[in-house]
Design a protein with these regions (language model features):
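Ribonuclease/tRNase effector modules and their secretory precursors
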Residues: 1-96
């Protein structure tokens, strides 16, 4: 299932990054590294997101929604999936 609006407001997700309340899955770190991004570079992409980068919201578990963004970076287009529970989790970060 998916919906057309972000589950978490983008400003809230970006504030969590700035407050250090963020972590990443291993696969997202690996995908970022394949594109030339270290963790700080991935965070820079998240803080630069705009509403226009939003693609969809989906969930694998009906209690955990994931917001999907598709920003364009100097390294190319990124498929970026975020979820917020207690902190921001970068679930997916890979070349589109």
């Amino acid at each position: 299932m998916e919906k057309g609006l972000p589950h978490c407001k983008l400003a809230v997700a970006q504030a969590m990054v700035k407050a250090g309340k963020v972590r990443s899955t291993f696969s997202a770190l690996a995908g970022g590294a394949e594109m030339g991004f270290d963790f700080d570079g991935m965070l820079a992409v998240v803080t630069a997101l705009t509403a226009a980068d939003f693609c969809m919201t989906s969930h694998a578990d009906h209690q955990v929604w994931q917001d999907v963004y598709r920003p364009t970076t100097p390294a190319g287009e990124v498929y970026l999936k975020l979820t917020v529970i207690d902190e921001l989790l970068i679930v997916s970060f890979k070349e589109l």
